[in-house]
A protein has these predicted regions:
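Short amphipathic alpha-helix that is part of the acyltransferase structural core
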Residues: 1-38, 154-188
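Conserved donor-binding loop and adjoining core beta-sheet/short helix segment
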Residues: 8-10, 23-107, 223-238
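Acyl-donor-binding surface of acyltransferase catalytic domains
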Residues: 71-75, 84-159, 304-306
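Active-site acidic-Proline motif in GNAT/NAT acetyltransferases
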Residues: 83-86, 247-249, 253, 281-282
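Conserved acetyl-CoA-binding loop-helix of GNAT-fold acetyltransferases
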Residues: 89-103, 243-246, 252-269, 287-292
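Conserved beta-strand-loop-alpha-helix junction that forms the acyl-donor binding cleft
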Residues: 114-124, 248, 277-287, 304-309
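C-terminal "cap" of GNAT-fold acetyltransferases
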Residues: 140-160, 273-284, 294, 299-315
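Phosphate-binding active sites in nucleotide-utilizing proteins
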Residues: 181-228
Length: 315
């Protein structure tokens, strides 16, 4: 028998219980189950637009499945994890949790929903169909061995970079990021508060947050950046290009490749032996650029998307 509960705010005990479940899932799948945005919301105990839905084993009271929703700037993020020992119940548990999650979203005005799944199966497709979601974007995780081959580095135009200065560069970075990702559902529309939440993360290191300023004009202008990440608690040998972008007004100058190589060189110097990044499957230009640097596809992540109608519109 299973009991279900919904929390709009998580106590330290709730967070500890769910963290143990997430750790078990991560160990089984060798994959972090929640993205940074969802994880920060959980760790902070919830904020406006947060809900944590838990399925507990009646006999022991232990969480065996967890679903979380978090409101973003223009959409809702949703995720579902099931204890590896109870995955024979994925359809039953997932259907119950996801239906309650979408009910909450509907009651809070509805909107666009994104559910990201690593290695989507027929069960995920069935669960998505039950809550009227359909396949959307597909992300490729690509990896490359570090350090890069010398011929790759030699064939890349070197550009001057400097490390992000906390308390100084936030506004310039937000301007370029939001221009570059103006239509992106997750990376667009960042605020200083959201940036500061990432800066408070244990893995944040400004020395690996590389900025390229143009200095041959009257005022130094941020033209591109490469934000790298090494989560030493997860795997100190994998270095991620967390976010990379070129201001749209400076496209076509090869800055994307130059900043990618600069970021990978930094990660190698910090001890990473594998470089990793995510890219949309339909971004063929970026994929071609990364392939020339030696990247290959490691796995795919599928988004299930849909529009949840506000309950107010249904009455």
């Amino acid at each position: 028998m299973v009991e279900f509960e919904i929390k709009r705010n998580m106590t330290p005990q709730n967070i500890a219980e769910i963290t143990r479940l997430l750790d078990a899932v991560e160990k089984a799948d060798n994959q972090k189950p929640l993205n940074d945005h969802l994880w920060i919301d959980l760790r902070q105990g919830g904020r406006l637009g947060f809900a944590g839905l838990t399925a507990r084993q009646h006999r022991t009271g232990q969480p065996i499945a967890y679903c979380q929703i978090s409101r973003g700037n223009e959409s809702w993020a949703i995720d579902l994890v099931v204890d590896p020992q109870h995955r024979d119940q994925t359809l039953h548990l997932g259907n119950a949790l996801l239906r309650e999650a979408t009910k909450i979203i509907s009651e809070e005005g509805g909107g666009q929903v994104n559910w990201w799944v690593c290695g989507a199966t027929s069960e995920h497709n069935e669960l998505a169909k039950h809550i009227d979601l359909h396949s959307g974007r597909t992300l490729l995780q690509m990896r490359v061995q570090l350090p890069l081959a010398q011929q790759v580095i030699a064939a890349t135009t070197q550009v001057k970079t400097q490390s992000f200065r906390v308390g100084v560069d936030e506004d310039a970075w937000l301007n370029v990021n939001n221009r570059a990702f103006s239509t992106h559902p997750e990376q667009g529309g960042w605020t200083k508060r959201l940036l500061q939440s990432r800066q408070s993360e244990k893995w944040f290191d400004p020395s690996g947050f590389l900025l390229h300023f143009l200095s041959d004009i009257s005022k130094p202008t941020l033209a591109a950046f490469c934000w790298t990440k090494i989560d030493r608690d997860l795997d100190p040998k994998i270095g991620e290009i967390y976010v990379i972008a070129v201001d749209p007004q400076f496209h076509g100058q090869g800055l994307g490749r130059s900043l990618t190589v600069a970021g990978l060189n930094y990660l190698a110097s910090a001890g990473a032996t594998t470089g990793m990044l995510f890219v949309d499957k339909d971004n063929t230009a970026a994929i071609a650029t990364y392939a020339k640097l030696g990247f290959t596809v490691h796995h795919e992540e599928q988004a299930f998307i849909g529009e949840i109608v506000s309950s107010a519109k249904q009455t």
